Amino acid sequence: MKLPLLGPVSVTGFQNPWFFLALLAVLLVIGLYVVQQFARRRRVLRFANMEVLERVAPPHPSRWRHVPTILLATSLVLLTTAMAGPTSDVRIPLNRAVVMLVIDVSESMASTDVPPNRLAAAKEAGKQFADQLTPAINLGLVEFAANATLLVPPTTNRAAVKAGIDSLQPAPKTATGEGIFTALQAIATVGSVMGGGEGPPPARIVLESDGAENVPLDPNAPQGAFTAARAAKAEGVQISTISFGTPYGTVDYEGATIPVPVDDQTLQKICEITDGQAFHADSLDSLKNVYSTLQRQIGYETVKGDASMAWMLLGAVVLAGAVLAGLLLNRRLPA
């Protein structure tokens, strides 16, 4: 839970739970207060002139006199919770990661079922993804048709990546496995440079395609898509896939209209092998939404952060309220 002006309020992940032993002192304060109230009443009844007492003392003492002590006890509980060091999940931008954008440029990407055509829409959404991705992440670009080409090695230069995306042109065949292997090689190369003492940076492949692989025909062949996915799994690289298009896509080839329906099965299997996530998009807007989701997933990591400030501020406010209530109601500090 996150409160305005205060930040996250968490009751989990305490770093110093032994501070809760201080709550025993709070219980002691409450107990002493109760005992004091009973003792005070007995003293009054023992030594006071009852006729005078009945005339000057209110028949029922105001319950508001207990408010300062209640607030004091509450503030001590809040401050103790702050001292125990609660934590909450915090999303922080990644500053050393590699993302490879692998885009299918086979001739089926010229289908106009997604206006103006699949490839043009992919270009626009891909450039938006490049702009939105956390600036410190190294982004690379691979295109694949019959073969795969590393157009832009992983870099933080977004202009270079967008220029590479603009250069994409349709070509025959679909060699999905080649695209994945090329991306893995680029990841390995930049990892050897960036690794250092911290080891290779975390990496992710984002694979966008509209159809099943046809080079080779068997995805389990040495250069096939499933073989490449298993290689990615072995390297600890997740592959997120985007199947892009509709079941009604067509392209014109030598005077004939050829159906090119989108195929989800191959890409879903690649995700299963690598423990990645599969997406489907059938319009430019939905493709942009998918890329935005990926950007939020890839560009940040979740870590445990300190969440004691909210408890500290609440405790301070309640403590100030206890002091003020004591002065206004009882004409003394709460005790």
From Swiss-Prot:
Chain segments annotated as transmembrane: 18-38, 67-87, 309-329
Main location: membrane
SUPFAM superfamilies: vWA-like (SSF53300)
Entry's Gene Ontology cellular component terms: plasma membrane
Its membrane topology: Multi-pass membrane protein
SMART domains named among the record's database cross-references: VWA
Localisation per UniProt entry: Cell membrane
Listed InterPro entries: Aerotolerance_reg_N, UPF0353, UPF0353/GerABKA_families, VWF_A, vWFA_dom_sf
Domain VWFA residues, every copy: 98-294
Keyword annotations: Cell membrane, Membrane, Transmembrane, Transmembrane helix
Alphabetical list of Gene3D superfamilies matching this protein: von Willebrand factor, type A domain
Family label: Belongs to the UPF0353 family.
NCBIfam families: PRK13685.1
Annotated protein name in UniProt: UPF0353 protein MAP_3435c
Organism name: Mycolicibacterium paratuberculosis (strain ATCC BAA-968 / K-10) (Mycobacterium paratuberculosis)
